[in-house]
Structures are given as structure tokens and as C-alpha cells.
Design a protein with these regions (language model features):
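Glycine-rich phosphate-binding loops at beta-strand->alpha-helix junctions
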Residues: 271-289, 594-618
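Early-domain small/polar-rich strand-loop-helix modules and first-structured segments
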Residues: 2-227, 370-385, 390-392, 397-422, ...
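A short acidic Gly-Thr/Ser loop motif
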Residues: 28-34, 340-358, 362-366, 402-403, ...
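Acidic, glycine/GT-rich loop-and beta-edge segments that sit at the periphery of enzyme/chaperone cores
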Residues: 19, 32, 48-52, 87, ...
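Phosphate/ATP-binding catalytic cores across multiple sugar-kinase/actin-like superfamilies
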Residues: 3, 7-12, 17, 21, ...
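Conserved phosphate-binding/catalytic loops in two-lobed NTP-binding clefts
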Residues: 298-311, 618-649
Length: 991
């Protein structure tokens, strides 16, 4: 077992015997409302005889349901007689009674199951109309079946986290069960314990209950919060991170418990590899803490590459292939735009969950990468090798925008509706209450009175609108409702029970009123009875004398629900629309947007997307957009996978990343006619998903990074992809914002205190601002570094190279008067050459009769004084720095794996032009995890060197180095903790 307890990991001695590792991994999706875990276990690979297990079960179920249904349900457009004849003929051919036909699909006899399908297709009768109806229904069933994700065939196991209910989802509500070695309970057990504790609690014990139960620990992520917890008379202070870490530990324990108790076989070994998802717009402080906190649980390999929106996209992409690459790939290609041997489409993921909204816009490109077969090689049955490359065009979202925000708005509406009803009933004499009468007579705001009496509906109208927060009376209405029905428990723990009872009613109202309205457009309603209202008032000391209990009820309808939910839903869909339009808008503003790139596939995820008002709002916004072709077939929402999709998608993505293989090795499979698919998951991290801007004195922000910028591996010893800004001036306060799309919200991402640095360097302000330069660096996790330097940076040279002195004329120095006298080049089209130009790929360009297809590396005659860099050496015995040039990125290496450099000369006697070979530099023998650019340096000693990535800076770990010119000091951006808007936090105690 893993050392899940928080305090044990640091005290443990290394074991003498190496731990036995579980050969797979698990993916954790810790949600605001619910959590799931998916396990990858390679212990056995099932062989499908008909279809993968999940698809076969769905096909059996759907056919059984269909053939057992009456004609009016099975095929509404055909006559009952035709349907009965159809069933009778199938039953006769299968030698079974029509009433027992469904048994064929429930038995394990596969031959009989296949024969039943054959008989369905043979028994279509003579009526063309009937045949069309049956064929259409069969197509719908098959289409649904082929879209069932084949989890088992991919060795992916949704972990049953709630053993008693056999449920793979568990509510994220948590109860602290142990303070020493902090432990939690989660799910319905925690929820039931909370209800029981509140019902039995006294005023004193309620404080303990508030400290012990946490409805949704995820909402604390990234916050520097402390929680005083009282348990069994002991009190301790715990941090938000400890609470979340304990929740992960509990999910891992539940996964281990399932492995021990499940009837299936599992591989042995300790869980030491994990994939952990996080919200798409989580700041880098969250991403960094995820990895650290899970590692502290004894998990030594933690992957945090996949945010929630990207994970959902990978899941539904996998579902799109239907578990059959031969059919799935061809089906996928028909929905793409083809250009040569590439097929592409744009996918927008909109995941509105319980607490957060996550978005990702991804370009999927399928490319035929089938290896070349030599003439003597057998091509066999001609399978194809495809590579699918997802490119992240942009991501966005909101950390406090989801289903719980909608429930909170229904909570407020319901609370005010109850208060309005009770005050009206007192005014009309339908009930008597001294407390409410005193409230009307002495405390009620005048806007709610008419001739000294409560004005019916005056409270409700303040909230029964789309954006009630903008109404000046909004707060007054809520404050008045609080006097009737107190639920604000932050300062009064005794109100906790009323809050949770009303919250449960609001959640029930959301689920009922959020359904699709009846066909006759009659209103859906949700009603609280007199008994339910009385239960709510038990804690408020409001005593009622009711004349007619049947007349006491409060009703909301679906129109009121939609008005309350509208602003949150429009906000989420507005973010999606803004992201889509900003990324797909043509660069040329004169170009017609209707002819621009479009979103080809919209994936909806998260249970909030099941609300009818969400789907109607999506139609309203997307159907008229020039960036989306409205087609219901290309809008995917599958309720049963709305939560599992995140952990399953992340688990599958990690499988693809770890089990990649070379196309050449697939030839034996291709000969058998089997298509192969590689999904280049890592490509998701090669481009920036959003903009970053720097605050200036005016309202205009300075863009430092643009969405879509390509990331590269800057140093061979690093395992991240990065991009840097140019060197720029520093400010006393350097503030960085994230902006997902133009005109989108600005999120404070981090800051760097230049004034503090200035004081440490003992510089005057004018000197500091003039001398100190800053360069920002960002990686694929959106984590910033701040590079600082006085003046221009110096570079560190620590690799060998080739000497140009042997080919450069003795009478002509390499550098003179601050200029380069010789040119160096590689392939590419260029202007007229000068003596001394140096090139690469000269021989390659001559081979293909393209003598101009070289690439100029260093050019003669340029004013090099501004381009010369200062070099410091770690080898060659050099004790003094020198000067030199750094090239732009070189073109790709030829197949030889080396660039050959030539110098251009004109023979003084014959006036003939020629290239003289300097020598070759091989591609550095380093393995890079991400795309890498290569550069060469040329110093004043005539040494030409090849570098992988950026030429490294001359650096120091001490800030004191900034007192001398050229030394680079690396600092970190001061990250911002998550700021929580209490108006959007249902469980902060102020509602």
C-alpha cells in the first residue's frame, strides 16, 4: 500500500527492497461536484468475437428494447399490422415465441445472436415504407453502438468508487474523519453524516460541524486559506492544500479498495504513476501544486499535462473512431477538409461542470504516414498508417461558472419567493405571525410597502429577472428575505440546517425545471408544500398559524428558472463564442468572415449541458455565427459520459503518449490490412493557448506573448517547451495578465517587484530603469520565468567547433572594423553574393540544379557592431571573453544529419565564383522532448559551433551579478493565488 497518510512520506527510510510497481497508471479527475478515477491495467487484452464488449452489450440491449416495444414506440410511422408481421416472421425463423424474442439478445449464445440480426435484415416485408423505416431505425441503433467507447478493449477501467451503489462517480463533498495523519471521507457517506450531525447538533457543536464538513474542497484550490478544524475535542489548523491532498489520497485509497474487492483480475504492485487533471484556466500556481501534492502521497511519477477540456476532447475523439480503426478512420475523413494526404477539422469543447467551465479549441489533422515499401517488400492487404495531430488553437474558461452557480441563483429566487409568499399571506390574513407582522410594520423598506402594507410580488420582482444584480433593490430584497428565512450561517451556525434544506430544494428545482418542456409547451412547475416550508422555518423562530394548509405553497415555473439561469449560461457560451471567433477570424480584416475557417465539431460535456436552456442558448448563439456551420449531427453530448470523459480521456491520452511506436515497425500489421493510428498528444503543448499582456501607464496593454506562438525546447537538458520575449525595459512594478481572446476578461497572472530589486542593488531609480533589462520566458504549463540583465546579455560557450582560419585568406581577417568580412550560409533563396559569404547545403542545392537554394547564415558587410555578442568560454583554455555572432535558426538538417558550411569566394585571377568547403557540423547528439531549433555561433577566433536550442546565457545564482554588465539572473514571477468571488461561492455562509 502507498503511504497515503500525509505526514508519513517524509519520515520514511528508503526500503532495502525496491517497490514493485503497478505496470499501469490511474487518472484522477477531482471535480467540484463529483469525482472519477480511470485505471489503465495491461494485465490482459480482451479479444472481441463480434464487437468490443461494451458495444456488443449496447447492441443487445437496444435490439431487445426495440423488438419488445409496441409499434407506436418502435416505429411510429408504420402500421401496427406491419410491425406485428415483422416480429412474427423473425420469431418464426428463429423458432421462438414472439413474446420471448428478447431472450435471444439476453443469452450468451453468440451464433444465435448473430442469426437474429441476420433475420431482422431479411424480414423487412414488401412495403417500401416499412423497409425504409426499419433501415433508418437500424442505422440509428448501429450509429449509437459504434459510438460507445470501448474502454475494456483499451485496458481502461472506470473505478467503482461507491462500492455499495456500484457507481463510478462519487460526490466530492468531504468530511474530515481524522486530524493526526489527516484523513477524509467522501461522497454520500460524508453527505449523510453531515445531515445527521446538523439535525442532532447543538449551537456549540455546529461550529465543529462547519469546520469538519466541506461541500467542495476543489473550490479552495490555489487559495492560501487556513481552516480551524475541531474533531473529538481537539482543534488543529489545516491548509486548503492539505484538504485537497487528503481528498486525492482518499480517491487513491478507494481505487486500491476497488482493486482488492472487484471480481476481475488486476495487476499487482503499488500505484506509483498518476495522471491528474485540473481546470483549463487554473493559474500556474495550481498546476505546480498539483504535481507536488500528489508526489508527496508517494506517487513518484505524476503527469499533469492534460487539463479538463483537452482530456474531454481526447475522450470524444477516441469515441469517434468507434473502437474500429479501419471503419472509424474512413468515417472521420468524410467529416474533414482534405488537402493532399491530410484531413483536418476544428473542434470546440465546451465543458460546463458543477463548479467550472472549461473550453478548448483544437485543430485535428489526420495525415497518411504509411511507410514506403521497397520493390522487394510485400505490400500485403494494404493497411495504412495514419498520424493524428491535435493542435491547441486556444483555451479558456471560468473557475466559478457552472451548475452550482445556477443552483445558487435558484436558491436566492426560491428564498425570496418564500418570503414574498409568507408576507403576502400575512397581509391577506391567510396566516398569522407576530414576527412577520412586526417585520412589515417596523422593518420593511418602503419600496416593498403600499399604503403601509406589504406590496405583493415586490420582493420577488427584484430577483425574477435575467440580471437582478444590477437592480438597486436586489440587496434589499435578499436582506428582507433573510429576516423571514435566515440561511446566512457564517456568523450564526444554527442556520446551517435551513441553508442545506433550501439548497437541496433549489437543486431539485434546477433538475426538474431544466428539463425539456412538454410538446404542448405547457409550463413545468416545482412546488414547495406547507410541510416543506414549515420545516424550513423551524430554525427561524417564525411561528405561523395557518388557516388552510392546502393554500400554503410556493411554486416556480420553468420560465422563472430560465430567467434566473440565463446570465450564467450566456456567460459560459459567450466565452466559447469569443474564443471561437478570435481564433478563427481571418488575419485580413477585408476578408469575408463567412469564408473563414469554421468549427466543424462542437463537443458538449459536463452535466450542466443537459439543461434544455443551455442547448437552446447554444443554438441561438452558434446557428447564426459565420464560424460554425449548424449541423445537429456535429454536436456531441452524451449524458452517460459527461463526468467519466475527463479521467478516461486523460488516461487514454497518457496511454497514447507512453505506447508510441515507429511507423517502420508497423509494416507487418499493415500487410495484414490493419490500419494503424498514432495520436501525437504531445503536439498539444507546442503552441500557446492564450495571450499574455503587460500593464502600462495607460489603459493600453503591451502584448508579450500571443496565442498560437510556437514553443520550442530551448535547452537540451530541459524537458519543457518554452518561448521567450525580446529583451525589454523593466518597470518598478511588472504586472502580467492572461487574456484568452481579444476583448476577453483580463486575469491577473503574476507580478514581479522591480522596486524591491532596485533597492537590493542599491541603484537610483533612473539608473535602474536605464540599465536593467528584462526578458519573460513561458513554458507549456504557462509558468513564467523572469530573466534579468544589466545591458545586453553575455553568452556561455562550452562546446567544440570547426576552425575557419584554414580556409580564410591570411590577408583578410575574419572581423575588421566591427564588421564580418566573410559570409556563411545554408539553403534558401538569397540576393547577390559577396566574397566571404559562408553557406550550408551548397552541395545539396547544386545536386538538384538549384544553385540559389542555399541559406545565408552570416552575411558580409553588415554593420555587426550592433549584432556582436560577448562570449565567455568554459573550454579551449580561454580566460578572457571574446566577441562573436549568433545565427538565426538553421533550416532542417539533411538526411546525413549534418550541415556542411561553405565560404563564397571570387578567384582574383580568373574572376570565377566558387564555394570553398569549410567543414561539417553534425546535429548535436541530444534527445529532445519537444521541437528544437539549431543555431551556430562564430567567434572572433574563427571557431564555428553548433548549438541545440538557444545559446545559453552567462548566468549567476546571485542577484549581485546584476551589478555588472551581461550576467543574467533568473527569477520567478510572483504567482497570484486564486481569488474567490464570494457572490459566486454557494458554501461561504453569506447566502
Amino acid at each position: 500500500m502507498n503511504p497515503f497518510q500525509l505526514n508519513k512520506y517524509s519520515d520514511q527510510e528508503p526500503s532495502e527492497k525496491q517497490q514493485k510497481r503497478f505496470p499501469g497508471w490511474f487518472a484522477l479527475d477531482f471535480g467540484t461536484s463529483n469525482s472519477t478515477v480511470t485505471l489503465f491495467d495491461p494485465i490482459e487484452v480482451p479479444i472481441a468475437e463480434i464487437l468490443p464488449k461494451e458495444q456488443e452489450m449496447r447492441l443487445r440491449d437496444r435490439l431487445s428494447q426495440w423488438l419488445s416495444s409496441p409499434a407506436s414506440v418502435a416505429l411510429p410511422d408504420v402500421s401496427a399490422d406491419d410491425w406485428e408481421k415483422f416480429i412474427a416472421e423473425i420469431s418464426r425463423n428463429l423458432d421462438i415465441e414472439p413474446s420471448r424474442l428478447s431472450e435471444v439478445f439476453e443469452s450468451d449464445n453468440k451464433e444465435r445472436f448473430l442469426e437474429a440480426i441476420r433475420q431482422i435484415e431479411l424480414s423487412l416485408g414488401n412495403s417500401e415504407r416499412f423497409r425504409r423505416a426499419v433501415s433508418k431505425k437500424l442505422y440509428q441503433i448501429y450509429h449509437e453502438v459504434f459510438r460507445v467507447p470501448t474502454l475494456e478493449s483499451q485496458n481502461l477501467i472506470p473505478v467503482v468508487l461507491d462500492i455499495d451503489r456500484r457507481d463510478t462517480e462519487i460526490p466530492s463533498e468531504s468530511e474530515i474523519s481524522q486530524l493526526s495523519d489527516l484523513k477524509l471521507r467522501m461522497g454520500r457517506e460524508a453527505r449523510d453524516n453531515r445531515k445527521k450531525a446538523i439535525a442532532q447538533g447543538t449551537s456549540g457543536s455546529l461550529k465543529e460541524i462547519i469546520s469538519r464538513f466541506h461541500h467542495s474542497p476543489k473550490r479552495y484550490f490555489g487559495q492560501e486559506r487556513l481552516f480551524p478544524v475541531i474533531l473529538d475535542g481537539e482543534e488543529e489548523i489545516i491548509t486548503a492544500n492539505q484538504l485537497i491532498q487528503s481528498a486525492w489520497a482518499h480517491l487513491i485509497e478507494l481505487t486500491e479498495d476497488y482493486r482488492q474487492r472487484a471480481q476481475r483480475r488486476f495487476s499487482e504492485g503499488d500505484f506509483l504513476t498518476a495522471v491528474v487533471t485540473y481546470p483549463t484556466v487554473a493559474p500556474p500556481v495550481v498546476r505546480k501544486e498539483v504535481k507536488e501534492l500528489v508526489e508527496q502521497l508517494g506517487i513518484d511519477d505524476v503527469q499533469t499535462a492534460y487539463d479538463e477540456a483537452v482530456s474531454v476532447a481526447i475522450f470524444f475523439l477516441w469515441r469517434e473512431f468507434g473502437g474500429n480503426l479501419n471503419i472509424g478512420i474512413e468515417s472521420f475523413k468524410t467529416r474533414c477538409h482534405q488537402a493532399g494526404n491530410k484531413w483536418s477539422q476544428n473542434v470546440l469543447v465546451l465543458d460546463i461542470g458543477g463548479g467550472t467551465t472549461d473550453l478548448a479549441l483544437i485543430e485535428l489533422t489526420l495525415e497518411d504516414k504509411t511507410p514506403t515499401f521497397a520493390d522487394y517488400e510485400d505490400r500485403g492487404l494494404g493497411g495504412r498508417y495514419y498520424k493524428l495531430t491535435p493542435k491547441l488553437l486556444g483555451s479558456s474558461g471560468h473557475l466559478q461558472l457552472g451548475g452550482e452557480l445556477i443552483t445558487l441563483r435558484i436558491f436566492r429566487l426560491l428564498k425570496v419567493a418564500i418570503a414574498d409568499f409568507l408576507l403576502t399571506a400575512v397581509t391577506t390574513g391567510d396566516l398569522e405571525s407576530e414576527k412577520l407582522e412586526d417585520l412589515i410594520n417596523s422593518e420593511l423598506n418602503e419600496r416593498f410597502l403600499e399604503q403601509g402594507k406589504f406590496k405583493t410580488g415586490s420582493l420577488l420582482k427584484c430577483l425574477d429577472k435575467e440580471n437582478p444584480e444590477g437592480d438597486i433593490a436586489y440587496k434589499d430584497a435578499l436582506d428582507t428575505a433573510e429576516k423571514v428565512l435566515p440561511t446566512r450561517w457564517q456568523q450564526a451556525p444554527q442556520r446551517l440546517q435551513s441553508f442545506y434544506i433550501l439548497w437541496d430544494h433549489a437543486e431539485a428545482a434546477k433538475l426538474k425545471l431544466g428539463q425539456k418542456p412538454p410538446a404542448d409547451n405547457s409550463l413545468l412547475t416545482f412546488t414547495l408544500s406547507e410541510q416543506q416550508i414549515s420545516e424550513l422555518l423551524t430554525q427561524s423562530a417564525v411561528k405561523l398559524q395557518v388557516k388552510d394548509p392546502n393554500s400554503i405553497c410556493v411554486t416556480l415555473d420553468n420560465q422563472q428558472f430560465e430567467r434566473a439561469a440565463a446570465s450564467g449560461i450566456k456567460e459560459a457560451i459567450g466565452i466559447a463564442k469569443g474564443l471561437m471567433e478570435s481564433r478563427l477570424r481571418p488575419d485580413d480584416i477585408t476578408k469575408d468572415s463567412w469564408n473563414s475557417q469554421k468549427v466543424d465539431w462542437l463537443i458538449l460535456s459536463g452535466k450542466t449541458c443537459n439543461l434544455d436552456v443551455v442547448q437552446r442558448q447554444i443554438y441561438q448563439e452558434f446557428s447564426k455565427s459565420p464560424y460554425f456551420v449548424w449541423n445537429p449531427e456535429r454536436i456531441t453530448f452524451v449524458l452517460e459520459f459527461t463526468k467519466l470523459a475527463t479521467s478516461a480521456g486523460a488516461c487514454y491520452a497518457e496511454k497514447l503518449r507512453r505506447l508510441r511506436f515507429d511507423p517502420e515497425e508497423s509494416k507487418s500489421l499493415l500487410r495484414k490490412g490493419a490500419n494503424q493510428l498514432e495520436i501525437d498528444v504531445k503536439n498539444l503543448f507546442y503552441y500557446l493557448p492564450c495571450n499574455f499582456k503587460r500593464k502600462t501607464q495607460s489603459n493600453d496593454l503591451l502584448t508579450i506573448f500571443k496565442a498560437g506562438q510556437e514553443l520550442y525546447q530551448l535547452a537540451p537538458w530541459e524537458t519543457v517547451a518554452k518561448v521567450r520575449t525580446v529583451w525589454q525595459g523593466i518597470q518598478l512594478t511588472n504586472i502580467i495578465y492572461r487574456q484568452d481572446y481579444e476583448d476577453g476578461d483580463l486575469r491577473l497572472w503574476g507580478s514581479f517587484d522591480g522596486k524591491n530589486l532596485m533597492n537590493k542593488l542599491e541603484m537610483q531609480e533612473a539608473e535602474f530603469l536605464k540599465k536593467i533589462k528584462v526578458q519573460f520566458e513561458i513554458d507549456q504549463t504557462l509558468e513564467f520565468n523572469v530573466l534579468l540583465c544589466q545591458g545586453n546579455p553575455h553568452y556561455l560557450i562550452d562546446i567544440p567547433g570547426i576552425d575557419l582560419e584554414s580556409v580564410v585568406s591570411e590577408t583578410s581577417a575574419l572581423f575588421a572594423d566591427g564588421k564580418l568580412n566573410w559570409n556563411i550560409a545554408v539553403e534558401g533563396f538569397n540576393k547577390d553574393l559577396n566574397d566571404g559569404d559562408i553557406a550550408v547545403n551548397v552541395i545539396e542545392s547544386a545536386t538538384v540544379d538549384q544553385p540559389d537554394a542555399y541559406h545565408l547564415v552570416f552575411e558580409v558587410g553588415n554593420d555587426g557592431s550592433k549584432l556582436f555578442q560577448k562570449f565567455h568560454y568554459l573550454r579551449d583554455g580561454a580566460t578572457q571573453p571574446g566577441i562573436g555572432l549568433i545565427s538565426n535558426p538553421l533550416p532542417p538538417f539533411p538526411q546525413t544529419g549534418q550541415h556542411t558550411f561553405y565560404v563564397y569566394q571570387t578567384d582574383a585571377e580568373t574572376n570565377s565564383k566558387k564555394w570553398i568547403r569549410i567543414g561539417a557540423l553534425s546535429k548535436p547528439d541530444v534527445t529532445t522532448d519537444y521541437p528544437c531549433q539549431y543555431r551556430v555561433t562564430l567567434d572572433d577566433q574563427g571557431i564555428l559551433r553548433m548549438h541545440a536550442g538557444e545559446v545559453p546565457y552567462w548566468t549567476s545564482n546571485s542577484q549581485e551579478c546584476l551589478k555588472q554588465e551581461g550576467c543574467v539572473y533568473l527569477a520567478e514571477l510572483e504567482l497570484q493565488p486564486n481569488e474567490v468571488d464570494k457572490e459566486r461561492d454557494p458554501f461561504c455562509g453569506i447566502h
